[in-house]
Amino acid sequence: MAVGKEIRSKIKSVQSTQKITRAMQMVATSKMRKTQERMRSARPYAEKIREVMAHVAETNPDFKHPALERRDVVKRVGVILVTTDKGLCGGLNANALRTFYQYAERWAEQGIEVDVCCFGQKGYAALTRLDMKVVSSATQLGDTPQQEKLLGPASHIVRAYLDGEIDELHIVYSKFLNTMKQEPRVEQLLPLKTEELESEFPYSWDYLYEPDVRGVLDVLVRRYLESVVYQAVSENMASEQSARMVAMKAATDNAAQAIERLKLTYNKARQAAITTELSEICAGAAAV
């Protein structure tokens, strides 16, 4: 029964794969809870600093700051692209990259150049294959994002904006909606869209600034950008673990179905072989 041996070998192979995918599912489930807790704990700070930025922008409409001023002509944009270091997380990276490519094509049609700061090995590898301009990057971020590892690459492209080398700064990442759903998001970081902030927080406060409004805004903008980048990376990590858990569960279920089909095929082949042997025995006995 050469066919039977081949089927048994396939069954063992699929069972081994199923053990791996089940283990990866369990690990992803554990990590998913931790990343979601980290993401949710970071949200209040990010929301509060956005609120403060809205109030400061509204109470100082005549103050000129690079983070608030729109450039007359946009010749170059910067993009912070957040992806994962590892695969096996469904279409998470593919969707984020597809969204980035759509924006990049739109900018290219307008003659706008694109500089990219990339977080995550998957995005970095994809962009280098396409010879896109990656001005800074950070990979192997681990399961817990460290501010020190994020600030270096991000500060490089932020400084380029403040120095006038780029005219807009955007961030692309995977927004965590729930365990089953994550979607790519594109947000403009600089210049700040004050009208959106003001509509989000319609009331205002009056502030007294020490020593002056520019000094406060310089620090506030830096903290704002740090919180946005950290929040985006945290959201992306929560999305990664959720997508990986779902993908590994689907792989485990598919493996179980494949094993059942192979067992059925094996039993049919074995039954056919036994029937053939019995027929040959009966035919031999009749001939005698």
Curated annotation (Swiss-Prot):
GO cellular component terms, A-Z: plasma membrane; proton-transporting ATP synthase complex
One BP term from GO: proton motive force-driven plasma membrane ATP synthesis
Annotated SUPFAM superfamilies: ATP synthase (F1-ATPase), gamma subunit
Pfam families reported for this sequence: ATP-synt (PF00231)
Cellular compartments annotated: Cell inner membrane
GO molecular function, one term: ATP binding
Keywords, comma-separated and alphabetical: ATP synthesis, Cell inner membrane, Cell membrane, CF(1), Hydrogen ion transport, Ion transport, Membrane, Transport
Stated family: Belongs to the ATPase gamma chain family.
NCBIfam families: ATPsyn_F1gamma, PRK05621.1-1
Its job: Produces ATP from ADP in the presence of a proton gradient across the membrane. The gamma chain is believed to be important in regulating ATPase activity and the flow of protons through the CF(0) complex.
Protein name listed in UniProt: ATP synthase gamma chain
Organism encoding this protein: Laribacter hongkongensis (strain HLHK9)
